[in-house]
Amino acid sequence: MNGLQIAGIANITGTQLRGVQMALCNYATQVRGLQIGLVNYYREDLKGFQLGLVNANPDTKVQMMVYGGNVTPANIGVRFKNQLFYTILGVGSMYQRLNDKFSASASYRAGLSFPIYKGLSISGDLGYQHIETFDNKDEVIPGRLYALQARANLEYQLTKKFGIFATGGYGLTRFYNKSGNYDKGAIIEAGIVLF
């Protein structure tokens, strides 16, 4: 396929794509160009770029992450890790910068990872977190908030399927319905990586 392929739901190119695919989901055997969508997948070869929430290929490592920290103490996520780039989709509970009632969050992070020594790597990512405050809502705390976050991570892979990591970062928690920050501060996290 040469040129531009646009669809509302999915694009499928069984052979080589030379150009651009734009849809919610994109698939091509070989890509010479750009895939833009929520989920992008190529099977054999990429000479170009994928721009989406999840970018995958046969070599993508799909890893489960379990972690906690000073902002949300209980989190679980799925990381789609390629050679250099990765994305993380996660959920967490008990957002700590509210009162003590139940709250939950959903997050998306995208970043770069660099190996520095046998099993040791550093990475950095930018993220967005949606926070549902549930019963915490009052005159000061709205029903929903969002956070913009930056993190630096240090990860050590103990075995091929098990690793540990520590994270430091900074986040701004903001209102959806008005300008200004609800809160801001440091992020400290640690956890494990499976698979």
Please place each PLM-identified region on the residue numbering.
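Repetitive, compositionally biased segments used for assembly/scaffolding
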Residues: 1-60
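Long, low-hydrophobicity, solvent-exposed regions enriched in small/turn-prone and acidic residues
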Residues: 1-4, 18-19, 33, 103-118, ...
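Residues on the lipid-exposed face of transmembrane beta-strands in outer-membrane beta-barrel proteins
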Residues: 24, 38, 53, 74-80, ...
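Residues that define the transmembrane beta-barrel architecture of outer-membrane proteins
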Residues: 18, 30-32, 47, 68-74, ...
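Outer membrane beta-barrel transmembrane domains
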Residues: 125-149, 153
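Sequence/structural signature of outer-membrane beta-barrel proteins
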Residues: 11-13, 27, 41, 58-60, ...
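Long amphipathic alpha-helical protein-interaction segments
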Residues: 44, 48-49, 53-82
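Repeated loop/turn-to-beta-strand initiation elements of outer-membrane beta-barrel proteins
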Residues: 16-18, 32-34, 46, 83-87, ...
